Amino acid sequence: MISLPGVYLNEDDYNFDIALRRFKKQVEKAGILSEMKKRQHYEKPSVMRKKKKAAARKRLLKKIRKMNMA
């Protein structure tokens, strides 16, 4: 079972802005928004592989550039 982020407020220290900020941080940390954007449209497996390969190439080139500068 997946635990979803949630923020509980007491009547004593009810500060909506702080609670909202805390909730947004938990949602971002859980990766819910990025997962939702990823699943918003169907992506063919071939397109996913192509994107993954391009990202790996980009990381490799970045690593090479970083090594050349140092």
Curated annotation (Swiss-Prot):
<dbReference type="Pfam" id="PF01165">
    <property type="entry name" value="Ribosomal_S21"/>
</dbReference>
<dbReference type="InterPro" id="IPR001911">
    <property type="entry name" value="Ribosomal_bS21"/>
</dbReference>
<dbReference type="InterPro" id="IPR018278">
    <property type="entry name" value="Ribosomal_bS21_CS"/>
</dbReference>
<dbReference type="GO" id="GO:0006412">
    <property type="term" value="P:translation"/>
</dbReference>
<dbReference type="GO" id="GO:0005840">
    <property type="term" value="C:ribosome"/>
</dbReference>
<comment type="similarity">
    <text>Belongs to the bacterial ribosomal protein bS21 family.</text>
</comment>
<dbReference type="GO" id="GO:0003735">
    <property type="term" value="F:structural constituent of ribosome"/>
</dbReference>
<dbReference type="GO" id="GO:1990904">
    <property type="term" value="C:ribonucleoprotein complex"/>
</dbReference>
<dbReference type="InterPro" id="IPR038380">
    <property type="entry name" value="Ribosomal_bS21_sf"/>
</dbReference>
<keyword id="KW-0687">Ribonucleoprotein</keyword>
<protein>
    <recommendedName>
        <fullName>Small ribosomal subunit protein bS21</fullName>
    </recommendedName>
</protein>
<keyword id="KW-0689">Ribosomal protein</keyword>
